[in-house]
Structures are given as structure tokens and as C-alpha cells.
């Protein structure tokens, strides 16, 4: 894959364009200036209070601006993570009391999804029941597990703050399985960025799951100041911006990062409607261990967000993703990777949006999938069996989490096999969709890979005659992980150009190309087809760009021949004569 091409696209092109991010929070100063032209909807979800104003402490305006503020009032100085994304805002603050209320998570997520938002971020949570799986956690898992059924829906990434109660635990609904739960790390001053924000809520959940999932900048974060707020304070402020700390600030940073990941998937490599679990997997894939190597842990989860590491890792390192597979009870799905250079790192992340658990149960995992990695010599590594931040052999399978990770510092040369197993299927749905993200040396990356479908060539007349116009077709399928636009496909017959066509293919798509042909000579005609004949496109493999086949051509009609080319009549009065003729069927057809 052309790393420079992707890097340029990432640096200059990713800004959240085309993404709608929903924010559920206190209220919004929609006239601030940093949201101009990008408000896809602003609504109140507070019972009895139709106002969407941000009148108390400006929390919602600050959060929304961290996701996608344009930086207009600061000449770009305090720009959000995804400054060209659109905002769908749901105001939750009761103006009289300043408390947050809503009609429920189901209602909030449904209205946001129906408005076109595919990312929903929430910098709020319960002030009790820390670590517990609440009815709100159930609701979040219900919506996300439904929408990640890719054959019917478009997927949604939902994020919740871990809360600021430190060792008391993670605030529900951040305890939901399928959401991305975000803790905070230091943003500025001593220890940043590799130390935790002191008050960030720690895991695990009551049923033992790893939370938070990731961490993002959580202290001294400068963002928009609501002009309507009566008690906007913070540790610094000017007319248009102020500084707040907390996992409320970290979560929108992760949401903005999610918007960039989703933009990359949909616009750069052409993967439409990615599962929310794939966005989660890619953020975890690139997450960096902070301080001593000890992931996963109850402070940072799988590490701090690093988008470059998620999407364009250094060197000859590729990324492979799949969010279009599903599994049912007892099944095993395998992926193989040919690692051609020893001594390089390898990381695989499996995520799935699990069927909702129950607030009355002590066990929340319903569909238990397992991740395994098998080395060329047969050594097996299990998901989430870690020591000192890296996977080790042995250990027991994880039957608690719906995120499983394997990470190695060094791999041997040869074929490595990833296995996804459905070891226990407890939900009511037959199929469990999942997402997998892999990073490693010579791993199939996010490039397209158009190739010819075996045995797909067809001639409208199986054995055409000379001069007969027929239709010649061949099928091409994109077996890669990225889309390709207007890649040329050339056809030749007996080394002469038959024609060239352009084809565009999304991942997994198949197209049939058709050429008209009228053979000029009988006998064997050699057909050759070439994808990208001038080698101008980045592909996972160039070795499958050629296809050839022989077509037999017959001469038309019946041929008449004789031993004597002419017959001479000597008796002009004779009324009859004899001439031996031979008739030959030259069409190879009866």
C-alpha cells in the first residue's frame, strides 16, 4: 500500500466532513460562532423544559466544541478534533435546577440515529451504583447491538465518560458492554500525556470487565464558553473559551477521534456503514500503553488514543479490518496472514456488540466469542492473556469481556492464523456480528484488491464463427478491504487490443464487464485480461491482475471441394455429366 498517499490524506483531509455527531449534554450556545453552518439539529430531551440553552455552567457547549468546534473565535487556536463534522445536539438540562434529565437513553439514541448521527457522545453518568450494570446500560447495549447488525442497519458508535470518582468506579451507563467508555489522561503540564488524570473513574465493572476502554486528554482542556452561562468558571477563561477538567472533556475528544476514524473508513477506503464495534476496535488497535507496560489495566484500559497508530502505522506495517462477518454457536472463522519478515510486532483486536445483559444479573456477557492467534509452529495465544503489556502463551480463555486483544513484540516468519470462535451463544439472536482489526508487518492493509472471478469468462456463442459478433464477459471482484474507483481493465485478443473499461468496486463487490467481438480468423483465439495494466493503483496484491483463456473459432457454413478444380464437357449435346464433390462442415457444429 502507498503509505505516503494515505498519510497525506490523513493529515490534510480528515476533518470529520460528512459525519454527524450527536451530543447529549446540558445545552448549547448555538450562536457561539464555532458551530456556524453545521447544526443538523438542536432539540431538548428534558421533560417539561423545551429550552436548549446552556444557562448554567456551559458544560454542553464546552463538550460539543471539543468534538467539532471550528475555532472561528480563536482563529483556529482552539479547534475541535473533527472541525467539519455536523452536530446534532440533545439538551438535557432543566433550566430551573441545572440538573440533567432525559426521556431515556433508548429515546435519545433512537432520535439521533433517525437524524443521521452515527456517533453519539455522552459526558454524563449516574452518581450512584458505580461499577454496576444499570437499566441504562441495558438500553445502550440494546441499541448498539441492534444497529451493528450490518445486514439491516448502519451501525452507531456510542461513547460514555468513565466519571470522576476515581476508585469508586466507573459511572453507569459507562458500564455498558458495547459503548466506548473513556477515561482521562493528563493533557498539559507535568506528566502529560502519559499519566492519568487523577480523578478519572477506574475499573473494573462489578462483573469484572475491563473499563475504561481507552483514555483521552482530560485535564486543562480549553474549549468554547457559553455566552449564556451564569456560572461558567474553570481554571482559565476569556470571552469565548474556557478551561475545564474531567472525563467529560476526554470523552468528546474520543468522539471526535471516532468521527475521523469513521470518515477514514467511509471516504478514504470506501467502507460504507461501518459497525460501531469496528470504530471501537480501531481506536483500541492504535491505543498506546502509558508509562510502564501494563495494559490492560483498570486505569487506562487499553491505553490512550493515537489515531496515527490506528490508521497509518510506521514502516512496512499494514492494517486489516473486517466488520462484515457474523458467527453462530459452535462456528470458527479464520484469517491467515503471511508474515514475510521475522522480528516485527503484531496486534489483533476483536470486538462485538453483545446482546444486552440484565441489571439483575451478576454476569453480563451473553454471546461469548474468543480470539486466538496461532503461530507458524503451532503456538497458540489467547485473547486478553497478558503479562507486562504483551500476550503470553497459556492462560484461560476470557469469558467476561466483549473486547479481546492479542499483542506481540515479535513474530516469526511464516503463516499466522487468527481464529474467531463462538464458544457460547446465550443471546436470542442466531447470528452475532463482530469486528476485527489487525496490525502487523505484511498484514493485508486497507487497500482494494480487484481480481478476476475464477471460471467467470463467458462467450455468448460458445464456438463463434468467423465474422459473427458475440459478447465476451468476465467478472471482477474486490476481495480487499478498501474501495477502488475507475481502475482500468484491458482486454486483448491474440495480442490485439479489444478494449479498456473503467470499473469502481467497494469491498466485496462484484461487477461483470462485457466486450463485443467479431472474430476474423478460424482456430484458437487467445484472450487476455489485465487489471490496472499500467500499475498505477495501490492494491493489496498485483499478482492476481491477469486472466487468460482460449476461445475456438470456426469458419462459417459448409466448404465444397473436389479432386479436379474444373470439369470439361466434350460433348455439347450431352444432357448429363458427373463430378465428384466433397462437402465439409467447417463450423464445428452440426
Regions found by a protein language model. Give the residues of each.
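Catalytic-core environment of secreted peptidases
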Residues: 33-35, 39-40, 145, 185-193, ...
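Hydrolase catalytic cores
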Residues: 64-67, 92-93, 169-172, 218-294
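Secreted peptidase-domain scaffold signal
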Residues: 298-369, 430-454, 459-460, 559-571
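Short proline/glycine- and polar residue-rich coil/turn motifs
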Residues: 327, 395-400, 410, 502-511
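Extracellular/luminal regions of secreted and cell-surface proteins that mediate adhesion/ECM remodeling
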Residues: 443-566, 570-590
